[in-house]
């Protein structure tokens, strides 16, 4: 394998990093730096903050977010499989059945443990 084949990948990585880093550096170097006490104060619709902005969230919200990500990734895995269903054959079908079985068993476990209850 020739190293010249990796040159486009290296160029792509460098351009991507440049697109992300160059605007940050230019803004830092060329931007005005005028610190002011009003810029560092908390702002809440033109008034001073009435209370601390940090609120405690229930852990169940995080659980719902994690479950959403889990099942969203499930769809991300199933979509390419569905497109290539004819090519993967019986072995691919069996692998997806095992994958779905593991997900369903995990979902039933969470359900039985009461992790999805809001009471």
Curated annotation (Swiss-Prot):
Keywords: Cell inner membrane, Cell membrane, Membrane, NAD, Quinone, Translocase, Transmembrane, Transmembrane helix, Transport, Ubiquinone. Its EC number is 7.1.1.-. Pfam families: Oxidored_q4. The keyword Cell membrane applies. It is found in: Cell inner membrane. It is a multi-pass membrane protein. The chain crosses the membrane at residues 9-29, 63-83, 88-108. It catalyses: a quinone + NADH + 5 H(+)(in) = a quinol + NAD(+) + 4 H(+)(out). The keyword Transmembrane applies. Its main location: membrane. GO terms for molecular function: NADH dehydrogenase (ubiquinone) activity; NADH:ubiquinone reductase (non-electrogenic) activity; quinone binding. It comes from the Bacteria. One of its GO terms (cellular component) is NADH dehydrogenase complex. InterPro entries: NAD(P)H_OxRDtase_bac/plastid, NADH_UbQ/plastoQ_OxRdtase_su3, NDAH_ubi_oxred_su3_sf. NDH-1 shuttles electrons from NADH, via FMN and iron-sulfur (Fe-S) centers, to quinones in the respiratory chain. The immediate electron acceptor for the enzyme in this species is believed to be ubiquinone. Couples the redox reaction to proton translocation (for every two electrons transferred, four hydrogen ions are translocated across the cytoplasmic membrane), and thus conserves the redox energy in a proton gradient. NDH-1 is composed of 14 different subunits. Subunits NuoA, H, J, K, L, M, N constitute the membrane sector of the complex. Belongs to the complex I subunit 3 family. This is NADH-quinone oxidoreductase subunit A. The lineage of its organism: Bacteria, Pseudomonadati, Pseudomonadota, Betaproteobacteria, Burkholderiales.
């Amino acid at each position: 394998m020739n190293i010249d084949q990796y040159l486009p990948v290296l160029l792509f990585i460098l351009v991507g990093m440049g697109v992300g880093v160059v605007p940050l550096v230019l803004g830092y170097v060329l931007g005005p730096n005028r610190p002011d006490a009003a810029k560092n104060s908390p702002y809440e619709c033109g008034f001073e903050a009435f209370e601390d902005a940090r609120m405690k969230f229930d852990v169940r919200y995080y659980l719902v977010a994690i479950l959403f990500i889990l099942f969203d990734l499930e769809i991300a895995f199933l979509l390419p499989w569905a497109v290539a269903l004819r090519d993967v054959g019986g072995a691919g079908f069996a692998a997806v059945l095992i994958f779905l079985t593991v997900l369903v068993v995990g979902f039933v476990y969470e359900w039985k443990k009461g992790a999805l209850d809001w009471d």
